[in-house]
């Protein structure tokens, strides 16, 4: 079972419907969560991209309250970030980075492939962890 299928199972267990290959009015929208339904864009190319977007939308399910589409609001931006952080921790995490290293992943591509995420998602998560912890931290 790949990462996308695992996330689909998690969503199903939580009573969340997933609409795959949705046509959004804007190509900039890759996913949307509303009322226990997650819609994923038809423009997502593969299961890895779908997994990254689904993880973030699940993060919104678990962490957001209300309609956060209007990103001009500081509170909505904070909730957007919380959903993204949930996805980073769920799909990558510090332990995942360590495991990738222990499995001899040598670069961003190998690490992303090992973790089942896109290089962009991994890079964004690494930026988040660097901002939070600096270049070094201890993990129990």
Feature-to-residue mapping (PLM):
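Active-site hotspot residues in diverse enzymes, especially metal/ion-binding acidic/histidine motifs
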Residues: 1-140
């Amino acid at each position: 079972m790949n990462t996308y299928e695992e996330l689909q199972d998690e969503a199903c267990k939580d009573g969340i419907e997933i609409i795959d290959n949705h046509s959004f009015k804007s190509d900039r929208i890759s996913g949307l969560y509303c009322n226990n339904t997650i819609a994923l864009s038809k423009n997502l190319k593969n299961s890895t991209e779908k997994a990254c977007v689904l993880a973030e939308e699940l993060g919104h399910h678990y962490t957001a309250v209300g309609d956060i589409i209007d990103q001009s609001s500081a509170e909505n931006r904070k909730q957007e970030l919380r959903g993204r952080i949930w996805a980073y921790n769920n799909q990558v995490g510090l332990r995942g980075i360590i495991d990738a290293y222990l499995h001899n992943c040598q670069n961003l591509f190998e690490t992303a492939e090992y973790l089942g995420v896109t290089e962009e998602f991994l890079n964004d998560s690494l930026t988040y962890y660097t901002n939070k912890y600096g270049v070094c931290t201890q993990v129990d």
